[in-house]
Amino acid sequence: SHGGKDLAHAIQRLNDLGYRCDLFTLDAKWFVPQSRVRLFVVGSLDSLPVAGWPNADLRPAWLRAFVDRHPNLLVQTLPLPPLEPSQATLKDYVQRLPPSDKRWWDKQRLEIFLTSLSPIQSQRLLRLQAQSELSWATAYRRTRNGRATWEIRADAISGCLRTPRGGSSKQALVEAGDGRVRVRWMTA
């Protein structure tokens, strides 16, 4: 936050205590079907083996740029193994509800959802609907030009949605296939 000033300050404080730091990110999608990127700062009192900047998944370009902008910080990189994304998708975890379950949106709410989709989102939904098997995707509401619209994720994972005030935003779950579509709020 604050253009990297908070991170630079935290690393400098760790450096002042004698720690060298490694920085890397982990995304939950490497373990479960959810995208949730987190930054890790690992401090060591011992000198770390220098690994350069391998594995762009763990150390994206923005992280390298941060380190380049702060040459005074003691940052060294650990040799971390590459991570393979999880093969799990929403279908492996989604709670199966019968069509009669009250949590599915009624026709009126479904129609509002469908009419709020952009042409690209409508095409995405039509492709899912045309499949012979049921599939699941998450959708989230955004405001575009003062109008609420729904966007359906193209992958089979859920996102980590944050509101401008720092809280979480709810996701909808789209179930489509065999010519049908149903939508409801995501459940545990």
Predicted regions and their residues:
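Class I S-adenosyl-L-methionine
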Residues: 1-153
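Acidic glycine-/aspartate-rich tracts in secreted/extracellular proteins
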Residues: 48, 166-167
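Cytochrome P450 core scaffold surrounding the K-helix E-X-X-R motif
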Residues: 170-174
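Low-complexity, glycine/alanine/valine/leucine- and proline-rich hydrophobic stretches
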Residues: 175-188
